[in-house]
Amino acid sequence: MGQKIHPVGFRLGITQEHQSRWFAEPSRYPELLQEDHKLRQYIEQKLGRLAQNNAGISEVRIERKADQIDLEVRTARPGVVVGRGGQGIEALRTGLQTLLGGNRQIRINVVEVQRVDADAYLIAEFIAQQLERRVSFRRVVRQAIQRAQKAGIQGIKVQVSGRLNGAEIARTEWTREGRVPLHTLRADIDYSYCTAKTVYGILGIKVWVFKGEIIPGQEVAAPPPSTRDRDRDRGDRDREPRRRQQQRRRQQFEDRSNEG
């Protein structure tokens, strides 16, 4: 049943980590869980896809220590979150403290997403934005898959459901490139879901990204170099013999100078 279960929840404790890491008394657990939902909802409203300044928020991780809350905001555009001179992150902290009330200390750590085109949520968000602009879903999905493949992933699957291109009858279409082994527990699979609100109704977008297998005791293999890196390395190799010739000529000139 690997095709049906949530890929992230299926791998918690194996290859995936919890987004909220804290312990609480059973009586306080519902209250703190609701606080986590409010924190993520507030950050999504201020910096998410529908905000004026879209920072490309991929994930928000929450840790609690006594009266202190540590937030780790993974974003594609950290400059938008931090703001000029740190004004943006300070305004975000003040807004969160006002939302929760009380003497809560909130620490915000902004982490930049290294491979934006390989992040499942950012891919789903990109597809949703294009669908809301009435772009053909097949063109959008093909473009998103090509960008993800250039980022060095091993497989991707994209599913779009709803009244596609304004059709009278809703349907579901999906496209897969490469391997997406949902039954393999050691597979590092990133999954996300996003909705696009169009004039014809709501479209659901699901994205599965397979980044490789995580085997205990082995380091995670680095992603393959991009086309730009390969071209730069090839240029360095082409220039290397020329540098050696210049060094040899310089050495011969110095030898003649010493003889004279």
Curated annotation (Swiss-Prot):
UniProt keyword list: Ribonucleoprotein, Ribosomal protein, RNA-binding, rRNA-binding
GO BP annotations listed: translation
Subunit structure: Part of the 30S ribosomal subunit. Forms a tight complex with proteins S10 and S14.
PROSITE patterns with a match to the protein in the record: KH_TYPE_2, RIBOSOMAL_S3
Ranges of Basic and acidic residues composition bias in the record: 227-243, 251-260
SUPFAM superfamilies: Prokaryotic type KH domain (KH-domain type II), Ribosomal protein S3 C-terminal domain
Signal peptide residue numbers: none
Gene Ontology cellular component list: cytosolic small ribosomal subunit
Keyword Ribonucleoprotein on entry: yes
Lineage: superkingdom: Bacteria
Species per Swiss-Prot/TrEMBL record: Trichormus variabilis (strain ATCC 29413 / PCC 7937)
Region (Disordered): 219-260
Name used for this protein in its record: Small ribosomal subunit protein uS3
Gene Ontology molecular functions: mRNA binding; rRNA binding; structural constituent of ribosome
Pfam families: KH_2, Ribosomal_S3_C
InterPro entries hit by this protein: KH_dom, KH_dom-like_a/b, KH_dom_type_2, KH_sf_prok-type, Ribosomal_S3_C_sf, Ribosomal_uS3_bac-typ, Ribosomal_uS3_C, Ribosomal_uS3_CS
Protein family per UniProt: Belongs to the universal ribosomal protein uS3 family.
Domain KH type-2: 39-114
UniProt cross-references to PANTHER family, sorted A to Z: 30S/40S RIBOSOMAL PROTEIN S3, SMALL RIBOSOMAL SUBUNIT PROTEIN US3C
